[in-house]
């Protein structure tokens, strides 16, 4: 959160925050900054006040949450088991692409998933959601429907990308860029 707020302080004028995955919680909280004109969630979490990603994950379990693919370091950081990265994070990519992403992943502090949202920006600002229809990390399926549920609750402009995995921004970069451009145009009117 602090890193995003530092960057916002450096901006000259309005901006749009874009986030993927757990970054959605970050822009949900940081997006209340007056310089933020809109929010774009790309296969991302979108918690409400009093919620956090860990609890939302229990309410809407994904294939990932039912697996042992997430590993934890002794000092409290989490990462994808590289052997399972392709299956759960990047199923629509080639094995070579997924292996590269697995080797270059950034570890995340496990406590980040427990950060409780106080004031969700999507309640007062326009938002867009890119739903990755074959996401196994954040469940978009009809039985759990988390990405779609988030978007409906926030009244987000929603674009669903058929066949896309959690790493929707790789193979479907044009669709993701189009949503970001659409958001920028909408808030600049």
Task: Label every PLM stretch briefly.
Residues 124-131, 158:
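Catalytic His-Asp charge-relay segment
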Residues 133-170, 182-183:
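Conserved loop-alpha-helix segment in the C-terminal half of the alpha/beta-hydrolase fold
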Residues 18-23, 27:
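Gly/Ala-rich beta-loop-alpha elbow adjacent to hydrolase catalytic centers
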Residues 103-121:
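Active-site nucleophile elbow and catalytic-triad environment of alpha/beta-hydrolase enzymes
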Residues 1-15:
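Conserved acidic catalytic loop of the alpha/beta-hydrolase fold
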Residues 39, 128-135:
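Conserved strand-to-loop "acid loop" that flanks and positions the catalytic carboxylate
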Residues 10-13, 183-188:
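Glycine-rich phosphate-binding loop signature in dinucleotide/nucleotide-binding domains
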Residues 32-82, 86, 109-113, 138, ...:
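Flexible "cap/lid" loop of the alpha/beta hydrolase fold
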């Amino acid at each position: 959160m602090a890193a995003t707020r530092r960057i916002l302080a450096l901006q000259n004028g309005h901006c749009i925050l874009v986030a993927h995955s757990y970054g959605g919680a970050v822009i949900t909280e940081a997006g209340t900054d007056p310089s933020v004109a809109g929010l774009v969630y790309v296969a991302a979490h979108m918690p409400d006040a009093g919620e956090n990603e860990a609890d939302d994950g229990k309410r809407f379990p994904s294939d990932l949450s039912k697996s042992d693919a997430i590993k934890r370091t002794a000092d409290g950081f989490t990462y994808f088991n590289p052997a399972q990265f392709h299956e759960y994070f990047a199923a629509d990519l080639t094995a070579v692409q997924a292996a590269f992403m697995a080797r270059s992943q950034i570890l995340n502090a496990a406590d980040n998933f427990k950060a409780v949202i106080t004031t969700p920006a999507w309640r007062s600002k326009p938002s867009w959601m890119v739903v990755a229809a074959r996401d196994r990390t954040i469940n978009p399926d009809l039985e759990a429907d988390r990405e779609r549920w988030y978007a409906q609750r926030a009244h987000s402009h929603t674009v669903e990308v058929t066949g896309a995995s959690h790493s929707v921004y790789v193979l479907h970069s044009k669709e993701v860029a189009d949503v970001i451009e659409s958001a920028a145009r909408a808030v600049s009117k």
